[in-house]
Amino acid sequence: MSSFKKEHPFEKRQAEAQRIRSKYPDRIPVICEKADRSDIPDIDKKKYLVPADLTVGQFVYVIRKRIKLSPEKAIFIFINNVLPPTAALMSNIYEEQKDVDGFLYITYSGENTFGQ
């Protein structure tokens, strides 16, 4: 279970997601957290309002910048333990994979693909 889910009760999360969706219908409420046991840096904020027309690849770029990941390091994002297609629109992923509370939960992990 994500730490966001542990820290915030279901009713509160659901109410917040509904408020966000009604106030910003063209945005997707996303919770992005680092995978357990990953050696990649922690992200400075977990909650994102992502434009619906953003691709998964563009969102990965946003994450890379936020955690200041060097170019030789790889980053992988998972939604419900599945690697989403890079070209997929966040709006499509949201409709298919959103949690019952209304948020889309994304986990990121990394490994150095070029070795050291």
Swiss-Prot record:
Gene name linked to the record: ATG8
Keyword line: Autophagy, Cytoplasmic vesicle, Lipoprotein, Membrane, Protein transport, Transport, Ubl conjugation pathway, Vacuole
Topology in membrane: Lipid-anchor
InterPro entries for the chain: Atg8-like, Ubiquitin-like_domsf
Functional note: Ubiquitin-like modifier involved in autophagosome formation. With ATG4, mediates the delivery of the autophagosomes to the vacuole via the microtubule cytoskeleton. Required for selective autophagic degradation of the nucleus (nucleophagy) as well as for mitophagy which contributes to regulate mitochondrial quantity and quality by eliminating the mitochondria to a basal level to fulfill cellular energy requirements and preventing excess ROS production. Participates also in membrane fusion events that take place in the early secretory pathway.
Domain of life where this protein originates: Eukaryota
Subcellular location(s) per record: Cytoplasmic vesicle, Autophagosome membrane; Vacuole membrane
Site feature (Cleavage) residues: G115, Q116
Chain residues in the propeptide: 116
Lipidation (Phosphatidylethanolamine amidated glycine): G115
GO CC, any one term: cytoplasmic vesicle
Post-translational modification: The C-terminal Gln residue is removed to expose Gly-115 at the C-terminus. The C-terminal Gly is then amidated with phosphatidylethanolamine by an activating system similar to that for ubiquitin.
Protein name: Autophagy-related protein 8
GO BP: autophagy; protein transport
Family, per entry: Belongs to the ATG8 family.
Parts of the chain that traverse the membrane: none
